[in-house]
């Protein structure tokens, strides 16, 4: 392994990032680019776990707004994350990266069930592991899944790969010209200031387990690799003080 800052990472890839500018569904070209970015990090010997969102296909809160029972709508969202995971797995394996998908809801014909010890073993053997299906429970986001899985597999960091967002700002930079980008924050800052990085459950879980986060722009070439190697890009969130 080369000298990287992080040895085992959880990469959170939002569904929106896989949709690209089309805004819905899976953009094949975007998935190819993301897969190649992941391969460049895998080639460094870094152990990579990925959590896929599903917002490019379905969101539980959308279903609830339509009058659906929230739990039912959330389960649909979990299925969406599996579709994204399978697309990413296919692209990674096509470029020579051994990849396993583990789902929190069993569907053995297409993926392994989530087993923590097996996931860690895959990582130790140099395989990428994609966690799909969220936590397997309604009312929990895929951000919370990322925090939970990072704690379970003892990851060094959670990389929050955003779609055309290069860090955390004091306000929306697209609408507020006075918005200031933060280079560093604490988990408590995120919670107390209500900054839109991840939901409060995920933030609290990350803080309680002392897991740092790096929020960065997925759309800039080599950014995942740069973060892993310790480059000062995006916003780093860690600690309580």
Swiss-Prot record:
Region described as Involved in allosteric activation by GTP: 20-25
Reaction catalyzed: UMP + ATP = UDP + ADP
Residues given in the record as UMP binding sites: 54, 74, 135-142
Activity control, per UniProt: Allosterically activated by GTP. Inhibited by UTP.
Taxonomic superkingdom: Bacteria
CDD domains, alphabetized: AAK_UMPK-PyrH-Ec (cd04254)
Pathway in which the depicted protein is active: Pyrimidine metabolism; CTP biosynthesis via de novo pathway; UDP from UMP (UMPK route): step 1/1
InterPro entries: AceGlu_kinase-like_sf (IPR036393), Asp/Glu/Uridylate_kinase (IPR001048), Uridylate_kinase (IPR011817), Uridylate_kinase_bac (IPR015963)
Protein's cellular compartments: Cytoplasm
GO cellular component: cytoplasm
Role noted for this protein: Catalyzes the reversible phosphorylation of UMP to UDP.
Oligomer status and interactors: Homohexamer.
Family listed: Belongs to the UMP kinase family.
Protein name: Uridylate kinase
